[in-house]
A protein has these predicted regions:
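The −1 position to Zn-ligating cysteines in a subset of zinc-ribbon hairpins
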Residues: 35
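Short metal-coordination and nucleic-acid-contact micro-motifs, chiefly zinc-binding Cys/His arrays
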Residues: 32
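Mature extracytoplasmic domains of secretory-pathway proteins
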Residues: 61-97, 104
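C-terminal motif of bacterial Sec signal peptides marking the signal peptidase cleavage site
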Residues: 18-21
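Bacterial signal peptide processing site
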Residues: 23-25
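Bacterial N-terminal signal peptides that target proteins for export
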Residues: 1-11
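Post-signal-peptide N-terminal segment of Sec-exported extracytoplasmic proteins
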Residues: 38-77
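C-terminal partner/receptor-binding element of secreted or periplasmic proteins
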Residues: 120-146
Length: 146
């Protein structure tokens, strides 16, 4: 009879682990701790990160749009298996913006970790302010994700 409480504890732990692993939203990118899912390097700059979340809830993290697009071109996962793509807000590095709501600026002056040199902004106003500082061109998600 002493084994019964251990079984209950094991079931409880498995349930809690299962519920916490089912998060379908973006996960905070931890600089210096998380590794890029494409190049496997440690994520070094919190202003340029990105994430792909699959329909099954798996999260892929990237240190730059260059790695995000490289991962897409690698066909590691099919486009139809992707639930959402998020990019880090350049002005609020801990915020992840859904790809449908972003304004992208490409500029060599941005100097992103892997040379993608693309920053995401959550509003057109923020994009315009940044484009006054960083000479570059406006990009679209469709233009970088094929």
């Amino acid at each position: 009879m002493k084994k019964l409480p251990n079984i209950h504890l094991a079931i409880l732990l498995l349930t809690v682990m299962g519920l916490t692993s089912c998060s379908t939203g973006p996960q905070k990118i931890i600089v210096g701790e998380d590794a890029c899912s494409f190049c496997r390097m440690s994520i070094a700059d919190n202003r340029f990160g990105a994430e792909i979340i699959t329909k099954k809830g798996k999260v892929y993290k990237f240190d730059d749009t260059h790695c995000l697009t490289g991962f897409g071109e690698s066909n590691t996962i099919k486009n139809e298996d992707i639930k959402a793509i998020y990019l880090v807000d350049f002005n609020a590095p801990h915020d992840l913006i859904p790809s449908e709501q972003i304004f992208l600026l490409k500029s060599p002056q941005l100097r992103s970790p892997m040379g993608g040199n693309i920053a995401a902004f959550s509003s057109e106003q923020q994009y315009k302010a940044a484009s006054a500082t960083f000479t570059g061109e406006q990009m679209t998600m469709e233009g970088i994700w094929k």
